[in-house]
Amino acid sequence: MSGAILIVGAGPGIGLAAAERFGREGWTVVLAARSPRHLDPMVARLIGEGVDAHGIVLDATDPVAVQAGVRTADRLTGGLTTVLYNAAVVRQQDLFSMTDAEVSADVAVNITGGLNTIRAAESVFADRGGTILVTGGGLAVHPHASYASLGLGKAALRNLVEGLAPDLETRGIRIAVATVATLVAPDSPEATGVAETLWTLASDPSTGWERTYPLAA
């Protein structure tokens, strides 16, 4: 199985691990992030590992930029088969101590960016099918007051994925969420495990709309 994946919100943890996992299968990988300073070293690392990798600077909170970025990645790869939304603001803070600006900024990334990416991916896959993946979180089902904005975002995207999955499936588009119920550091076993979960979701349609990492014992 070969293909091409765009990872929106690529970082040194789950994003890079997923890029390496898909790259090992011969997939073309496009990383998208807001900062070239963080993006360029990741792309260089992938190329050094023999992965056909590209990078594009992209702000997921800008719907026009996301639409353009997805179409650019589609052209770069000769046809995307999967789009992953991986961006998040991880803020350990309760709702009542956050400023209005912090709430708005976190919602823009944790929710709106995901909506923008899902809409853009659907527009590309509408005529040929494809897979849309979302990096979710255990806070979506087990919330904690100290991670108010992150839990809100993960719950919203999980809800959206579950709601969209049946309709999109009838049009040849799969959408699924990897619910990550653990902390993940760069180059960690957890990052590798989440990447494997994402690969399973992309390559095995029988996994349904959600898969949790780590799997319950």
Segments (PLM) and residue ranges:
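Conserved glycine-rich Rossmann-like NAD(P)H-binding loop of the short-chain dehydrogenase/reductase
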Residues: 27-41
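Catalytic Tyr-X3-Lys loop
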Residues: 89, 96-115, 157
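Conserved glycine-rich cofactor-binding loop
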Residues: 11-12
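Hydrophobic positions on the long internal alpha-helix
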Residues: 69, 84, 117-121
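Amphipathic alpha-helical dimer-interface segment in Rossmann-like NAD(P)H-dependent oxidoreductases
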Residues: 75, 109-127
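C-terminal helical subdomain
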Residues: 170-217
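Rossmann-fold cofactor-recognition segment
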Residues: 46-64
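Catalytic loop of short-chain dehydrogenase/reductase
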Residues: 106, 131-156, 169, 184
